[in-house]
UniProtKB/Swiss-Prot annotation:
Keywords: Aminoacyl-tRNA synthetase, ATP-binding, Cytoplasm, Ligase, Nucleotide-binding, Protein biosynthesis. GO terms for cellular component: cytoplasm. This is Aspartate--tRNA(Asp/Asn) ligase. The keyword Nucleotide-binding applies. It comes from Ehrlichia chaffeensis (strain ATCC CRL-10679 / Arkansas). PANTHER family: ASPARTATE--TRNA LIGASE, MITOCHONDRIAL, ASPARTYL/LYSYL-TRNA SYNTHETASE. The gene is aspS. The keyword Iron-sulfur does not apply.
């Protein structure tokens, strides 16, 4: 028999009346009614109301002086509540326990934060006292939700014949794009392990090893700055790799997995379509490769409409190689001047020269600072391409292509929010496909990989030999949900001749590739199957399903914005003897 409890704090019902029970938990609330003190006892599962009577002086005095969140074990008799005190909001609301004996298991100091409060305490307090923060319902429920989601993901993968395999945590430095966390070797002086940014090479080698379908709930470590949707330090992903698959095969595997999880753990409407949007179209029409499809606004390129027009500012920009992008604003033609001025000021804060705009009256006649410079034919083309209606307005950005893309995307997002256009209680997924294989680094004045160097170029070796590298597309893909990238993946480059050629375009010799990726090139010499994979982010999925605004709300022990663990006081200094053992010394920053 368990000496601490006969029942959990959510289990007692009317049928337990007159039974003696033992309960353990935390003092959640106390209500002093003079000769009676009511205590809400909380454990992981629920709450039971305890009754302490003044007649039982010893127990009464003890509970009087105990602080909230102290841990106690009680023995008592289950009784029916008075009809006036029945609480249907809790499962045990028809009964209470009259306490006959109490043991203090752990006394609490004064609390730095109130467990019962929904107050938004400073992050410094919450993370330093995370063990208290995790007792709060909202945070606790997020962690429970995370556990259930991971369990469901495992079930889905196993049902499809995937094998869960753990890959090493100590490995070599990788080229994923972020900075590595390095671990010095005690035995091999001057050498370092790296914590994996992703199990990329290992999972590809597993395919070469003959495993057909692999997955794991993989920890990934990247020395990156924090964002609302990115936790510094570490994150977890559902890492997947499959042999003998095309891009479409990967899509067909992961779509039902995501739909199952999102439908099971949310009451929101889920659009079951996963539209395919090319990277080019995403940047053009949404101003982002992470488009939020709940926002119906579509950006259009109107450069040719303004070319050789009487509006000299845009016309001059176009002659210098700039572009013009249009962002519609439905039902805003009668908005006050301040509405338009605010958008112009917003664009300027982002580095824009400004914004142009045209408003269309109910008779579809055009007004605004630009309208008088455009003939009827050009105005009609704008109406048509932007799908405008009487009473609408349209904003214009004219900048270099990259800058115009960024600005138009920001204006689109702002308008979607201000005009209340973003769908509520909906999840909208999409695939972003056809990423560029290479990019031009203006700073280094060289060609480099756009994203994943291990992906297969569309067109294979022939494309690498004959096409402009900047025109080559990759078999790379992202899944985006409500403007948040939750997964990226690729069909891998499994042929050494294609790999060597691709890396040579990015400035790597064959010898450099063999040295940097020795394990992979060595494996590929012994029969590598076509393979591909994807890796949805667990943290971001939970964040979406929990309706959290910050990813740290769904991580049990997160680092703060500065990459510090306030609970464990990490990172910390290491004593000189330990440094000496690792052949390390600390140089002061100048």
């Amino acid at each position: 028999m368990n000496i601490y409890r006969t029942h959990l704090c959510d289990q007692l019902r009317k049928e337990h009346i007159n039974q003696e029970v033992t309960l353990s938990g935390w003092i959640y609330r106390k209500r002093d009614h003079g000769k009676i003190i009511f205590v809400d006892l909380r454990d992981h599962y629920g709450i039971t109301q305890l009754v302490f009577n003044e007649a039982d002086n010893q127990n009464f005095q003890l509970i009087t002086h105990l602080r909230l969140e102290s841990v106690i074990t009680v023995k008592g008799i289950v009784v029916a509540r008075d009809s006036s005190t029945i609480n249907t909001a809790v499962s045990t609301g028809f009964i209470e326990v009259v306490v006959k004996h109490v043991i203090i298991e752990g006394e609490a100091d004064p609390l730095p934060l109130n467990i019962t409060s929904t107050q938004d305490y400073p992050e410094e307090i919450r993370l330093k006292y995370r063990f208290l923060d995790l007792r709060r319902d909202k945070v606790k429920n997020n962690i429970i939700l995370r556990s259930k989601i991971i369990s469901e993901l495992r079930k889905s993968m196993e049902a499809m014949g995937f094998i869960e395999i753990q890959t090493p945590i100590l490995t070599s430095s990788s080229p994923e794009g972020a900075r590595d966390y390095l671990v010095p070797s005690r035995i091999h002086h001057g050498k370092f392990y790296a914590l994996p940014q992703a199990p990329q090479l290992f999972k590809q080698i597993l395919m070469v090893s003959g495993f057909d379908k692999y997955f794991q709930i993989a920890p990934c470590f990247r020395d990156e700055d924090a964002r609302s949707d990115r936790s510094p330090g570490e994150f977890y992903q559902l890492d997947i790799e499959m042999s003998f698959v095309s891009q479409e095969d990967v899509f067909n595997v992961i779509e039902p997995v995501l739909l199952n999880v999102f439908s099971k753990f949310s009451n929101k409407t889920i659009d079951k379509e996963f539209p395919r949007i090319s990277y080019h179209d995403a940047m053009l029409h949404y101003g982002s490769d992470k488009p939020d499809l709940r926002n119906p606004l579509i950006i259009q390129d109107v450069t040719e409409i303004f070319r050789d027009s009487q509006f000299n500012i845009f016309n001059s920009n176009i002659k210098q190689g700039m572009v013009v992008r249009a962002i519609p604003a439905p039902n805003t033609a009668t908005n006050p001047r301040s509405f338009f001025d605010n958008k112009i000021e917003f664009a300027k804060t982002l580095g824009a020269q400004g914004l142009g705009y045209i408003t269309f009256n109910d008779d579809f006649s055009a007004k605004g600072p630009i309208a008088k410079f455009l003939d009827e034919e050009r105005l009609n083309r704008i109406k048509s391409i932007c799908n405008l209606q009487p009473g609408d307005s349209v904003f214009f950005v004219s900048e270099t292509e990259d800058k115009a893309t960024e600005l138009a995307g920001e204006v689109r997002t702002l308008l979607g929010k201000e005009l209340n256009l973003i769908e509520k209680d909906t999840f909208r997924f999409c695939w972003i496909i056809d990423f560029p294989y290479f990019k031009y680094d203006k700073k280094e004045k060289s060609i480099n990989f756009f994203h994943n160097p291990f992906s297969m170029p569309q067109g294979g070796l022939e494309a690498l030999n004959n096409q402009n590298p900047l025109d080559i597309l990759a078999y790379q893909y992202d899944i985006v949900c409500n403007g948040i990238e939750i997964s990226s993946g690729a069909i891998r480059n499994h042929k050494l001749d294609i790999m060597y050629k691709a890396f040579s375009i990015a400035g790597y010799t064959k010898e450099m590739v063999d040295q940097k990726f020795n394990s992979l090139t060595r494996a590929f010499k012994f029969g590598a199957p076509p393979h591909g994979g994807i890796a949805p982010g667990i943290d971001r999925m939970v964040m979406l399903l929990a309706d959290a605004t910050n990813i740290r709300e769904v991580i049990c022990f997160p680092l703060n914005q500065s990459g510090e663990d306030l609970l464990m006081s990490a990172p910390s200094e290491i004593d000189k003897e330990h440094l000496k053992l690792l052949s390390l010394s600390i140089t002061k920053k100048s």
